[in-house]
């Protein structure tokens, strides 16, 4: 898995040192070892999925029929992957601007 730092170094023609590569690999191993995957029960994953969807749905309209949330493990690293198809954005920004203006008027 290429990190952002690796990509930038590659684009700039820099080579990563073996020490940096070893350090990054060790950090991944330590992070993986700290996470007890057995503690991620189906109930906990369902709760996380619901909370993620609730937060994202505040800002965009989601196609809930096509939502996919999964755990993927690759190279000793586990990731929570959420595929959230967006139908359209919600114009919450206008509401915030109006609310901010109202709050400023009240303070005056």
UniProtKB/Swiss-Prot annotation:
Keywords of this entry: Cell cycle, Cell division
InterPro entries noted in UniProt: MinE, MinE_sf
GO process terms (BP): cell division; regulation of division septum assembly
Stated name of the protein: Cell division topological specificity factor
Family to which the UniProt record says this protein belongs: Belongs to the MinE family.
Protein's UniProt keywords contain Metal-binding: no
Gene3D superfamilies from the UniProt entry: Cell division topological specificity factor MinE (3.30.1070.10)
SUPFAM superfamilies the record matches: Cell division protein MinE topological specificity domain
Protein's job: Prevents the cell division inhibition by proteins MinC and MinD at internal division sites while permitting inhibition at polar sites. This ensures cell division at the proper site by restricting the formation of a division septum at the midpoint of the long axis of the cell.
Cross-referenced Pfam families: MinE
HAMAP family: MinE
Lineage, top ranks: Bacteria, Bacillati, Cyanobacteriota, Cyanophyceae, Synechococcales
